[in-house]
Amino acid sequence: RPCPSQTHSLYRRALARPTETPTMLKIENLHARIGDKEILKGLSLDVKPGQVHAIMGPNGAGKSTLGNVLAGRDGYEVTEGSVQFDGVDLLEQDPEARAAAGLFLAFQYPVEIPGVNNTYFLRAALNAQRKARGEEELDSMQFLKLVRQKLAVLHLKDELLHRGVNEGFSGGEKKRNEIFQLAVLEPKLAILDETDSGLDIDALKSVADGVNALRGADRSFLVITHYQRLLDYIKPDVVHVLADGRIVKSGGPELALELEAHGYDFLKDRVVPEAAV
């Protein structure tokens, strides 16, 4: 048995030891397919709270499939591997439960919902999630106060509340509206699937400003993109290169610049053909 002085020394060392930040999202050896076509082929990834991870790669690498599988969209079958989100088995949950747990997917092509205005849609979505978590639903006044706070943070106008969901919106307006939805729903993990697709530079900056305004110690982002230009405005902590359904290289923001300079050809010697496995 240690003497009191030894016990005190052990206690002080334990206090001095840095506490490791828990992992928010842990993906291990994830395999997924659509029909007979396997798309994800052993993908592993760890994301900690507050981090921004960029997922880059050539067309057909599996970037959007990763986001869709995490969100639980129909048509994808997970055949192997595991996904833990805040210590819970994400793959066992339906899409609504995943959203209530704090996962948000911003679509590459946001859909229009004619005749349903943003206020009604967002209040219904938010209260459904609050109810699923056992929280009290917001009444009209509480909700209006919340959305006006979020509009101010994102420098958006009140008129957005009265428009139909993405109805008649330009590409940039649709993407800004999704960032507004993200702000109101306050997820723990936001997956942005090629948010920069089809945007001119002004719209891109506007969307990036919105994302940066929502960054925080408790919110993580997976930024899925084909091009480096989005990462000029949303600075990632980690950049991953996805090719043939696997992450083949990870690094800091400089990796995105390397891809911009040399393209994806340098990956060819890193991707092992299935026939050779």
What is each PLM-predicted segment?
Residues 25-27, 40:
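Conserved structural motif at the start of ABC-family nucleotide-binding domains
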Residues 56-58:
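The feature captures the beta-strand-to-loop junction immediately N-terminal to the Walker
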Residues 82-98, 166:
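ABC ATPase NBD Q-loop/coupling interface
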Residues 111-188:
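ABC-family P-loop ATPase nucleotide-binding domains
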Residues 191-195, 202:
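Walker B catalytic motif
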Residues 204-217:
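Helical segment within the ABC ATPase nucleotide-binding domain
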Residues 238, 242, 246-269:
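Conserved beta-strand-loop-alpha-helix hinge in the C-terminal portion
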